[in-house]
């Protein structure tokens, strides 16, 4: 563990000119370029050819989270504009229940122009579903760099989900350096997004179209879904010299029992679409270790801590860990596992479940680049040097890669 903790983030830097960051997506999602890294060799293709590089019987896992319109703008009587960015629900802390509220919802929020919001509530008049209402935001206690914010409204026929849909703005990554456009509402969601909760898209999935999904099924792959709600922490740069000083953000995950049964039963490789699916799948192993050690743990106690994989724990096989988790779900009569993960995957980590990965090109000095480096056993430079030399587009709206170490 000590070696991993002392990794210098400066060793994971590379020059990324601004013009290589894709500010907008391509007109057709699946026309993006695909870099294929296979056992150390690099080639390039187009995303529509992805099925050609995969095998029948493989299990492909997607993150079906949906980005919410999490940015709310209020104007004070003084004229000052305050932005409230909803990060995660506090009261109720269950996403579905929070979105269903009809009078009050509390969220952990980042507040823009905080110095202009010293005290008192903010108000916004609006019409939702033809119904007039006043939304009030009241700032509570400071929680680290974020704040507790209570939202109340005076029309019980309107849910908090309705309010976000009408009043909220889709949050796009800060490095795009532009305003959100109407087209982002469609292009910054995957075609299979279902479960509301993310404040950033699982961007590896943005390339998939119905025709690519159909081609994968025709090839004989089994497609399954998990949910990880992507937090704003995904954009937080590593500011410490060594990664030991970087605190990973907690993200909420949901996995159906059927998916865990599939992971246990299938004989082919597991292909993860995106780093969020990777983090969810790899977390399942450590959740299985916890259920092995604490058979009656609550779902909250199954939370995967940042450094847990690097600490001493029973050396279960992947099958043993997944079976332990499945037994736990059967004992507790759970159809779906709801917990959270803070896992950091960096060089020194041994992958337990994921054998192939579809992912975009990530920011320099980011934890996502560490995750990729751990997967390709340090050979990330080969991939990124090729992508830079061959006009690949980078970051959220950029091109894609298939990694087969």
Describe the role of every protein-language-model region.
Residues 1-405:
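Surface-exposed, charge/polar-rich loops and edge strands
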